[in-house]
Swiss-Prot record:
Bilayer disposition of the protein: Multi-pass membrane protein
Gene: mntP
Family to which the UniProt record says this protein belongs: Belongs to the MntP (TC 9.B.29) family.
Database matches in HAMAP family: MntP_pump (MF_01521)
Compartment(s) of residence: Cell membrane
Organism whose genome encodes this protein: Methanocorpusculum labreanum (strain ATCC 43576 / DSM 4855 / Z)
Keyword hit for Manganese: yes
Transport listed as a keyword: yes
Record's function text: Probably functions as a manganese efflux pump.
Protein name according to UniProt: Putative manganese efflux pump MntP
Length: 185
């Protein structure tokens, strides 16, 4: 049981890094409703990081044949588009930046950052490992990382100004490049 808890925590921290980075970038563009947005982002990212391992475990290997041909290209495009928009907006004087307030953007980002969690669930199914406890741990860690990512991004933006929005955009583009290298090339 201790091994499962420890390995689940390590996996959870690894999976939560993308959610944290996206939340940090989104928090950089926030002007108000900071705590509400942090909670909402935490719920979205936490839920999908929790649900995807369960889904992966439930459907097992066949889903990889559906996702492999195009899924990661969509994820890469999403990160490039949103990151590029943040960078563009920081130079064009657009104060909006990336909005974590809209549920559509949050939904897309939460799904995009939880693809790896789906693969974790599939892996658990292949080795016959129970998935509920790891999924709960993964979801809670993702909630916490996302919540604090929004707060940290907002705080840093008040110190660094639009440089933080540029950094946030660069972070999202780098996540896209990471997906491109790991899954598409």
């Amino acid at each position: 049981m201790t091994d499962l808890l420890l390995s689940s925590l390590v996996i959870a921290v690894g999976l939560a890094m993308d959610s944290f980075s996206v939340s940090l970038a989104g928090g950089a563009a926030l002007k108000d409703n900071i705590v509400k947005t942090a909670v909402t982002a935490g719920i979205f990212f936490g839920f999908f990081q929790f649900a995807m391992p369960l889904l992966g475990w439930g459907i097992g290997v066949p889903i990889t044949q559906v996702i492999d041909p195009f899924g990661y290209w969509i994820v890469v495009g999403l990160f490039f588009f949103i990151g590029g928009k943040m960078i563009w907006d920081s130079f064009s004087g657009d104060e909006e930046g990336i909005s974590l307030i809209g549920w559509k953007v949050l939904l897309l980002l939460a799904v995009a950052t939880s693809i790896d969690a789906l693969a974790v669930g599939i892996s658990f199914a292949l080795i016959g490992e129970a998935v509920l406890l790891p999924a709960v741990i993964i979801g809670v860690v993702a909630f916490l990382f996302s919540f604090f990512g929004v707060l940290a991004g907002h705080k840093l933006s008040s110190i660094l100004g639009n440089k933080m929005q540029i950094l946030g955009g660069v972070i999202l583009v780098l996540i896209g490049i990471k997906f491109l290298i790991e899954y598409c090339l």
